[in-house]
């Protein structure tokens, strides 16, 4: 090879290994930079979102993304896995310690895939299972007819009572006795009250069903000791690793049953997934280590305290909260007292730099893409450092936008009110910088 060719080769290699994202792909760099600006200057109230630590970001963006590792620690189908084995073993042991369980599978890539893995392990196509109705706060993977869970299985949905919007446990028991499901799924994405895991297990045992708990939304609160744990009661628990747990986006499956654990492991790999995302598993391990620290318990307590403060402030400003309040990190806000829809409210609040999502309320007369409510959550704001005082202010700002929207009575909203609130929001977020950023 000539000296010129060798120099060119070395230069190319130097660029590949050392050039920055900004140098290589300015378009993607720009989109990421703009998203960072959005996160810094907006109040994040989407209940399923949170903010990870710099340590989690560093782990997830590491060279572990290069490594294929099909199988499980000590039983891989590829060589060179001795260090990623350490990573996954740490994630497993930390998860077990965090939730007090005997077995943990940390490989699921998402919440949907973790639930699919349990179905694959414990059910056959056509089997009957019960889950919370989507309109009562359930999830697509809990039996929605548009989801695989609703297409492959016979789904019997339970819901909340019409008068108080609390889980109707009498209905759960009646439906279980009538339909003899093979599995009962408890947990949801928009239910703001404490779940009675013990009662669910009693019903499951009575009809000979597995009890599966999807605690994706409340896992951080369970880990922090401010919500009862389902682990002692359920045959199997699933959870995402983001949301209130404050880790990278992904899933996890927990159980105390060795036979179920074996079935779960086979269902995840090779049944559902191939090579696990080792860089994400590293991020999970870091997040679990953070959640095992004493300060995480204070974080979880603050999440709930902040949610209650926000709910009470909204009520004092004339809004209704589904079920009357919250015991966890989220609430459903009934917008009908302000003559607003979820679609309009989400857009108006977004223009004021307050991010949330439209959400159906129980027995909602509006269409799913319109809705009568919005779902609000406090995990991200609490991570940022907001306390009760700030969430009361946020509640007042939300009411201000909705009152302006009511006066405008149009999709365009009230520009003057929204701009005034936006300025207040930016003043608030500037006091609570993210990732070392000031101003």
Curated annotation (Swiss-Prot):
InterPro entries: PyrdxlP-dep_Trfase, PyrdxlP-dep_Trfase_major, PyrdxlP-dep_Trfase_small, Ser_HO-MeTrfase, Ser_HO-MeTrfase-like, Ser_HO-MeTrfase_PLP_BS, SHMT-like_dom. It is an enzyme of class 2 (transferase). One of its GO terms (molecular function) is pyridoxal phosphate binding. CDD domains: SHMT. Its main location: cytoplasm. It is found in: Cytoplasm. It holds the Pfam family SHMT. One of its GO terms (cellular component) is cytosol. Its cofactor is pyridoxal 5'-phosphate. Keywords: Amino-acid biosynthesis, Cytoplasm, One-carbon metabolism, Pyridoxal phosphate, Transferase. (6S)-5,6,7,8-tetrahydrofolate binds at residues 134, 138-140. Its EC number is 2.1.2.1. The modification N6-(pyridoxal phosphate)lysine is found at residue 243. GO terms for biological process: glycine biosynthetic process from serine; tetrahydrofolate interconversion. Pathway: One-carbon metabolism; tetrahydrofolate interconversion; Amino-acid biosynthesis; glycine biosynthesis; glycine from L-serine: step 1/1. It comes from the Bacteria. It catalyses: (6R)-5,10-methylene-5,6,7,8-tetrahydrofolate + glycine + H2O = (6S)-5,6,7,8-tetrahydrofolate + L-serine. The record marks 242 as: Plays an important role in substrate specificity. Belongs to the SHMT family. Homodimer. Catalyzes the reversible interconversion of serine and glycine with tetrahydrofolate (THF) serving as the one-carbon carrier. This reaction serves as the major source of one-carbon groups required for the biosynthesis of purines, thymidylate, methionine, and other important biomolecules. Also exhibits THF-independent aldolase activity toward beta-hydroxyamino acids, producing glycine and aldehydes, via a retro-aldol mechanism. This is Serine hydroxymethyltransferase.
């Amino acid at each position: 090879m000539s000296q010129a060719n060798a120099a060119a080769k070395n230069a190319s290699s130097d660029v590949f290994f050392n050039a920055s994202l900004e140098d290589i792909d300015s378009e993607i760099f720009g989109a990421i930079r703009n998203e960072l600006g959005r996160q810094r200057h907006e109040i994040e109230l989407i209940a399923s979102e949170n903010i990870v630590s710099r340590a989690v970001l560093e782990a997830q963006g590491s060279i572990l993304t290069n490594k294929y590792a099909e199988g499980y620690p000590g039983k891989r189908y590829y060589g060179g896995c001795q260090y990623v084995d350490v990573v996954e073993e740490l994630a497993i042991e930390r998860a077990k310690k965090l939730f007090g369980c005997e077995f943990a599978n940390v490989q699921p890539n998402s919440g949907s895939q973790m639930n699919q893995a349990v179905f694959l392990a414990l059910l056959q196509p056509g089997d009957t299972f019960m889950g919370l109705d989507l309109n009562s706060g359930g999830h697509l993977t809990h039996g929605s007819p548009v989801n695989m869970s609703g297409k492959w299985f016979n789904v019997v949905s339970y819901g909340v009572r019409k008068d108080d919007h609390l889980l109707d446990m009498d209905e759960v028991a009646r439906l279980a006795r009538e339909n003899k499901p093979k599995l009962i799924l408890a947990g949801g994405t928009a239910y703001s009250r404490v779940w009675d895991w013990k009662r669910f297990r009693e019903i499951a045992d009575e009809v000979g069903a597995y009890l599966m708990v999807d605690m994706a939304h409340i896992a951080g609160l369970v880990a922090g000791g401010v919500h009862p744990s389902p682990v002692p009661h359920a045959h199997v628990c699933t959870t995402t690793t983001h949301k209130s747990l404050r880790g990278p986006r992904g899933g996890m499956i927990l159980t105390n049953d060795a036979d179920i654990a074996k079935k779960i492991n086979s269902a995840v790999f090779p049944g559902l997934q191939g090579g696990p995302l080792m860089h994400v598993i590293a991020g999970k391990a870091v997040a679990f280590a953070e959640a095992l620290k004493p300060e995480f318990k204070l974080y979880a307590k603050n999440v709930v305290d902040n949610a209650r403060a926000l709910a009470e402030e909204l009520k004092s400003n004339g809004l209704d909260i589904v079920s009357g309040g919250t015991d966890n990190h989220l609430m459903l806000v009934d917008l009908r007292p302000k003559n607003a829809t979820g679609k309009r409210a989400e857009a108006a609040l977004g223009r004021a730099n307050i991010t949330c999502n439209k959400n159906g309320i129980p027995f909602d007369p509006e269409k799913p893409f319109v809705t009568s409510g919005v779902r609000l959550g406090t995990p991200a704001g609490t991570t940022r450092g907001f306390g009760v005082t700030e969430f009361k202010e946020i509640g007042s700002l939300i009411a201000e936008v909705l009152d302006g929207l009511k006066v405008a009575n149009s999709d365009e909203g009230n520009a003057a009110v929204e701009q005034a609130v936006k300025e207040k929001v930016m003043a608030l977020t500037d006091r609570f910088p993210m990732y070392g950023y000031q101003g």
